[in-house]
């Protein structure tokens, strides 16, 4: 039986390898993708006359340089600024505007609580435990000092925030209609991880000494002893398995937005169309019109010209135009 448990020792290496390879593949694929158009999404105008004052908020909303575009991405990543500004993304029946700042609040609570939880778990992988981990754990449980063990707020906050985010996808008609199975799958994984972790800490107590020995064996690449494996709690094995599966699943899910946002042209491109010409990287010779270099192929015939005049257009689509004329087809006003 103990030999079969060694699968749990190999599991994190397999899942982490899938995560690294998958993440590198997605990042390289995004980095190599050409951006044929300049499409920064802005809510402020470009710089114009010097006497037109632009605040630092305007510079973030409409970045005119790569530096301010980078600052804008930082605000998006760490403060979820776009989500905070998305206050009226749809209107309910009756003309009532729907404020979505609750979505921003619970989203930022979930992500930062999860970050604190991950940092707190470093105590299982280090010996001795770093002081900053001890300090963070103390601050996290400062409101639950009267409870043994102290109630760590981030675990509860993360679970409540996850319940809101998942309930929103289930209960709201608009969100339910655009949600796909993979959206619910990753939320299910996170729910199992959080619930099993809270159960181990407060209700079904697991022997954390064996958990730490197992964790240290994983990070030091030294297989644990059969005694350590035999004494791992079944709930910990469930918790650990879902953590590994989630890590391996990240490159194939929407969770990759943590890396994809850095490559989003609507966010990382400066809004400087008036000052700099954006050359289409797919266009090998931008000085010549595409009609001269490559032409347009219609029905197997390629037409090349300096400009698309009426005679060339009629020659290209003569058959279709004749067919329309034969059927005496005319557009009605309501069809526009």
From Swiss-Prot:
GO MF annotation, one: electron transfer activity
Is the keyword Repressor assigned to this protein?
Answer: no
What Pfam families does the entry give?
Nitrate_red_gam
Q: What is its main location?
A: membrane
Output the Gene3D superfamilies linked to this UniProt entry: Transmembrane di-heme cytochromes, Chain C
- Does the entry feature the keyword Transmembrane, yes or no? yes
Q: Where in the cell is it found?
A: Cell membrane
UniProt keyword terms in alphabetical order:
Cell membrane, Electron transport, Membrane, Oxidoreductase, Transmembrane, Transmembrane helix, Transport
Q: Which domain of life is it from?
A: Archaea
Topologically, how does it sit relative to the membrane?
A: Multi-pass membrane protein
Q: Mention any one GO cellular component term assigned to this protein in its UniProt record.
A: plasma membrane
What are the GO BP annotations of this UniProt entry?
anaerobic electron transport chain
Membrane-spanning residues where? 4-24, 60-80, 102-122, 145-165, 184-204, 232-252
The protein's job, in short, is: Has menaquinol-oxidizing activity. The HmeC and HmeD subunits may together mediate electron transfer from menaquinol to an unidentified electron acceptor on the cytoplasmic side of the membrane.
Protein name listed in UniProt:
Hdr-like menaquinol oxidoreductase cytochrome b-like subunit
Naturally occurring in which organism (per UniProt): Archaeoglobus profundus (strain DSM 5631 / JCM 9629 / NBRC 100127 / Av18)
What lineage, starting at the top, does this entry show? Archaea, Methanobacteriati, Methanobacteriota, Archaeoglobi, Archaeoglobales
């Amino acid at each position: 039986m103990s030999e079969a448990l060694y699968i749990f020792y190999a599991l994190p290496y397999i899942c982490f390898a899938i995560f690294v390879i998958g993440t590198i593949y997605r990042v390289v694929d995004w980095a190599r993708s050409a951006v044929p158009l300049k499409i920064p999404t802005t809510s402020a105008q470009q710089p114009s006359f010097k006497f037109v004052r632009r605040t630092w908020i305007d510079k973030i909303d409409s970045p005119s340089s790569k530096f301010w575009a980078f600052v804008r991405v930082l605000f998006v990543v760490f403060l979820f600024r776009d989500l905070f500004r998305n206050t009226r993304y749809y209107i309910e029946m009756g003309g009532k505007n729907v404020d979505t700042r609750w979505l921003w609040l619970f989203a930022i609570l979930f992500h930062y609580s999860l970050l604190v939880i991950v940092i707190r778990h470093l105590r299982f992988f280090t010996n001795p435990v770093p002081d900053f981990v001890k300090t963070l754990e103390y601050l996290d449980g400062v409101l639950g000092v009267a409870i043994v063990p102290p109630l760590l707020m981030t675990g509860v906050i993360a679970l409540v925030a996850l319940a809101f985010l998942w309930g929103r996808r289930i209960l709201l008609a608009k969100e339910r209609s655009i949600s796909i199975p993979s959206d619910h799958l990753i939320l299910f994984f996170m729910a199992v991880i959080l619930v099993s972790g809270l159960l181990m800490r407060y209700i079904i107590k697991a022997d954390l000494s064996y958990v730490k020995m197992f964790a240290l064996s994983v990070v030091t690449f030294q297989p644990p002893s059969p005694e350590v494996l035999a004494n791992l709690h079944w709930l910990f094995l469930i918790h650990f398995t879902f953590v590994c599966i989630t890590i391996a699943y990240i490159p194939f899910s929407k969770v990759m937005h943590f890396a994809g946002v850095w490559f989003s042209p609507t966010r990382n491109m400066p809004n400087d169309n008036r000052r700099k010409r954006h050359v289409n990287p797919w266009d090998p010779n931008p000085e010549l019109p595409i009609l001269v270099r490559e032409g347009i192929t219609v029905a197997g015939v390629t037409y090349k010209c300096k400009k698309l005049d009426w005679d060339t257009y009629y020659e290209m689509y003569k058959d279709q135009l004749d067919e329309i004329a034969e059927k005496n087809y005319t557009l009605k006003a309501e069809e526009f």
